[in-house]
Design a protein with these regions (language model features):
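Active-site/ligand-binding loops adjacent to catalytic centers
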Residues: 1-69, 112-138
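Generic beta-strand/beta-sheet core signal
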Residues: 50, 70-72, 98-100
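Substrate-binding/catalytic subdomain of NAD(P)-dependent oxidoreductase enzymes
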Residues: 55-83, 93-94
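Catalytic phosphate/nucleotide-handling subdomain of diverse soluble enzymes
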Residues: 77-138
């Protein structure tokens, strides 16, 4: 997806032999990929690359505020950080961060670090996410 975004194409740029801790997003030619790229262009969605270390940092930071997500879901946090720093996302903008995959889907990540389990207050979800984005990467 990122390669298509960077190349300004309207179709997926297939790849193979790619390994990442974020296994859920390693398919080299995802089903529906061309449609996603079409929507991304139509609605001016942004895309950003993240390193393996950045994925793990994001997963850990999300876990610290009560969101145990798989590495693939955690990629969005650091990507948003980079887009803010590059001023591609302006202060006060509405940003949607998809956290769809539970950390229980990919327990291999524990070989990189240990996470502590904590309770999260559902009424504070929006505040937690905004505080995370505003304060965690100062």
């Amino acid at each position: 997806m990122l390669a298509a975004h960077e190349a300004s194409t309207s179709i997926v740029v297939p790849f193979s032999n790619f390994h990442t801790v974020a296994e859920a997003i390693t398919t080299g030619n995802p089903m529906g990929g061309d449609e996603i790229i079409h929507k991304a262009k139509k609605y001016n969605w942004l895309a950003e690359s993240v390193t393996e270390e950045e994925i793990l940092v994001s997963q850990r930071k999300l876990g610290e505020v009560g969101y145990f997500v798989e590495p693939a879901s955690a990629t969005s946090l650091y990507a948003i950080k980079k887009l803010f720093k590059a001023e591609k996302i302006k202060e006060g903008s509405t940003v949607v961060m998809m956290l769809t995959g539970t950390g229980l889907k990919d327990l291999d990540v524990f070989k990189y670090y240990h996470l502590n389990v904590m309770e999260s207050n559902i009424e504070k979800v929006e505040d937690d996410v905004w505080n995370l984005l505003k304060n965690i990467y100062n």
